[in-house]
Swiss-Prot record:
GO molecular-function terms, A-Z: GTP binding; GTPase activity; translation release factor activity, codon nonspecific; translation release factor activity, codon specific
Job of this protein: Increases the formation of ribosomal termination complexes and stimulates activities of RF-1 and RF-2. It binds guanine nucleotides and has strong preference for UGA stop codons. It may interact directly with the ribosome. The stimulation of RF-1 and RF-2 is significantly reduced by GTP and GDP, but not by GMP.
Cellular component, GO, one term: cytosol
PANTHER family for the chain: PEPTIDE CHAIN RELEASE FACTOR RF3
Record-annotated tr-type G domain positions: 8-268
Keywords tagged on the record: Cytoplasm, GTP-binding, Nucleotide-binding, Protein biosynthesis
Organism of this sequence: Streptococcus mutans serotype c (strain ATCC 700610 / UA159)
Pfam family name, one: RF3_C
Record-listed GTP binding positions: 17-24, 85-89, 139-142
Family: Belongs to the TRAFAC class translation factor GTPase superfamily. Classic translation factor GTPase family. PrfC subfamily.
InterPro entries documented for this protein: EF-G-like_DII, EFG_III/V, G_TR_CS, P-loop_NTPase, PrfC, RF3_C, RF3_dom_3_sf, RF3_GTP-bd
Protein's recorded name: Peptide chain release factor 3
The keyword GTP-binding is annotated on this UniProt entry: yes
Length: 514
């Protein structure tokens, strides 16, 4: 098969949701259909604890939440599918936002009993800003939930996106009978031996069933007053196709997968800093690092840089140009993933995600190119932390492990590091409290370095220009520090001290990040 055909087979997407909406379960079921796992929640051929395949880090297994984005790949119906499972916990929005820069579409999982929740809304905004297609899966129909019409209305009002139901529930919870498939014009049956039935048979199958009658009434209303189906609007991210189902009982998931692959886009181009768009079908390889993960295999203390291939083909052993340093790097130890299992990869194409073994060469946001055409992709968003803690090594003899751990976890983007300009003290910045807990856990378990962490509370962070730097401006209410790139930054105690500083030094430009 030629390169263009291979690239056109790729479908790369992320799954987003609020915690506990069933994101990991639906990921499992998709892998099951892809033949990657024998049954959801278990790994093919491994006698291990019955943990979800996509939650691989120790702390995730203990808590049942995804705190890192895992990457999984499978083949299905002539397509090569790359799923990026994103952290559902709001404290990890930073990692999630960066992951959303590496996909061509998003699947939003919604709990039918709870509707649109805070975290879903936040992630949706990022996806919408990118203008990529969004597919909605309303989950947990095996339990009692809210009225389907209410859920659609909320989707449109809260998220501001038009919706089109691809199927419609017949009952819910104990009364759940199945789905009326509007798109394929058939019934999908929840009970009994037959999976599908024709619409004509529905009246006989569900004679005198009030839930079937209600479903037909709802559908009639939607046909008259609802949105029209438009593939063009889906691809622009203006219309979300809505699927109902139950990931836990694996009902409606395959129908969703078939439709998703029919409408989801093939890999798209990415913008460079000089506003050019790199076409996926360009023969020259290019890609960017969207995530760095240390210790995916605790036995080897390794680090993996996750690269989204934007154009061309990767071949094992090829040399690439690292735009940030201008140096040439050989890509020889490269893997592809199935959560914790991985295999060496000989070649991969635009749309694929590869893991490059990293000895400290890469940073999140790095651009890799080949050939004479040198450029950099648009920078990935960075987020200003709000919570801060001072951190130091508990055992002075473990300074080496302490510094190595901090350096690796900071490069991974799991936490942000600031150094007090005057005292040299380390200060950690996070978007949410859980990031500190994960940092402490990983320092102790992966680097054998116990840490002392002292809360500093909330801070307002502003960067200043190097030429404006004057240590005399620093005080207990506005601490002068350096970020991990040695750029000067002030940590203000609150908005009052920020405004006081701005009034006192009107010529100093204070810069805010995302």
């Amino acid at each position: 098969m030629n390169l263009q055909e291979e690239i056109k087979k790729r479908r790369t997407f992320a799954i987003i949701s609020h915690p506990d909406a069933g994101k990991t379960t639906i990921t499992e079921q998709l892998l099951y259909f892809g033949g990657e796992i024998r049954e959801a929640g278990t790994v093919k051929g491994k006698k291990t604890g019955n943990f979800a395949k996509s939650d691989w880090m120790d702390i995730e297994k203990q808590r049942g939440i995804s705190v890192t984005s895992s990457v999984m790949q499978f083949d299905y119906a002539g397509k090569r599918v790359n799923i990026l499972d994103t952290p559902g916990h709001e404290d990890f929005s930073e990692d999630t936002y960066r992951t959303l820069m590496a996909v061509d579409a998003a699947v939003m999982v919604v709990d039918s009993a709870k509707g649109i929740e805070a975290q879903t809304k936040k992630l949706f905004e990022v996806v919408k800003h990118r203008g990529i297609p969004i597919f909605t899966f309303i989950n947990k129909l095996d339990r009692d939930g809210r009225e389907p019409l209410d859920l659609l209305e909320e989707l449109e009002e809260v998220l501001g996106i038009a919706s089109y139901p691809m199927n419609w529930p017949i009952g819910m919870g104990r009364s759940f009978e199945g789905l009326y498939d509007l798109y394929n014009q058939r019934l999908e049956l929840y009970k009994g031996d037959e999976r599908f039935a024709s619409i004509e048979d529905g009246d006989k199958l569900f004679a005198n069933n009030p839930f079937y009658e209600q479903a037909k009434e709802d559908i009639e209303l939607l046909t008259e007053a609802g949105n029209e189906f438009s593939e063009e609007a889906i691809l622009k991210g203006e219309l979300t196709p809505v699927f109902f189902g139950s990931a836990l009982t694996n009902f409606g998931v395959q129908t969703f997968l078939d439709s998703f692959l029919a409408f989801a886009p093939e890999p798209h181009g990415h913008k460079t800093t000089d506003d050019k768009v790199i076409d996926p079908l360009d023969k020259d390889f290019s890609g960017f690092v969207f995530k760095i993960q240390a210790n995916m295999d605790p036995r080897h203390r390794d680090r993996i840089a996750f690269v989204r291939i934007v154009s061309g083909e990767f071949e094992r052993g090829m040399s690439v140009n690292l735009a940030r340093t201008g140096k040439s790097v050989k890509l020889s130890n490269v893997t592809q993933f199935m959560a914790e299992s991985r295999e060496n990869v000989e070649n991969a194409v635009a749309g694929d995600i590869i893991g490059v073994y990293d000895t400290g060469t890469y940073q999140v946001g790095d651009t890799l190119t080949v050939g004479k055409n040198k450029f950099e992709f648009e920078p990935l968003p960075t987020f200003t932390p709000e919570l801060f803690m001072k951190v130091s090594a508990k055992n002075v003899m473990k300074q080496k492990s302490f510094h190595k751990g901090i350096e690796q976890l900071v490069q991974e983007g799991a936490i942000q590091l600031y150094t007090n300009y005057q005292t040299g003290e380390y200060m950690l910045g996070a978007v949410g409290q859980l990031q500190f807990e994960v940092f402490k856990h990983r320092m102790e378990n992966e680097y054998n370095a116990e840490v002392i962490m002292t809360p500093m509370g909330k801070k307002t962070v502003r960067w200043i220009k190097e030429e404006d730097l004057d240590e005399r401006m620093s005080s207990s209410r506005n601490i002068l520090a350096k970020d991990r790139f040695n750029k000067p930054v002030f940590l203000f105690e609150n908005d009052f001290s920020l405004h006081w500083f701005a009034d006192k030094y009107p010529d100093i430009v204070l810069e805010e990040k995302m």
